[in-house]
Amino acid sequence: ASFQZAPPGBAKAGEKIFKTKCAQCHTVEKGAGHKQGPNLNGLFGRQSGTTPGYSYSAANKNMAVNWGENTLYDYLLNPKKYIPGTKMVFPGLKKPQDRADLIAYLKZSTA
């Protein structure tokens, strides 16, 4: 199922998902440093593997995904299937609502 078929995202619910499942490895604030994963500020419209100062896997650089609602929705279902060889150990969010909520939060928090 594509992002167009996803339920409407709730940014507040997405923030909770980010804090429990993503924040140990990622930051969203402008100017915040990288953790185990890259800072996600400015994520939408950026190509995968291009955040300055972060050491990406060759897989992330070579995949050249342009991050947006559709690509994030597919990626967050199963990151290792979407980008084989990614360093991201997160298994993914299986529920469409969880992915839609997280994307709604990321759109607000990384802009």
UniProtKB/Swiss-Prot annotation:
A GO MF term: heme binding
Gene Ontology cellular component annotations, sorted alphabetically: mitochondrial intermembrane space
Residues annotated as binding heme c: C22, C25, H26, M88
Post-translational modification remark: Binds 1 heme c group covalently per subunit.
Keyword line: Acetylation, Electron transport, Heme, Iron, Metal-binding, Methylation, Mitochondrion, Respiratory chain, Transport
Protein's job: Electron carrier protein. The oxidized form of the cytochrome c heme group can accept an electron from the heme group of the cytochrome c1 subunit of cytochrome reductase. Cytochrome c then transfers this electron to the cytochrome oxidase complex, the final protein carrier in the mitochondrial electron-transport chain.
Protein name per its UniProtKB record: Cytochrome c
Organism: Abutilon theophrasti
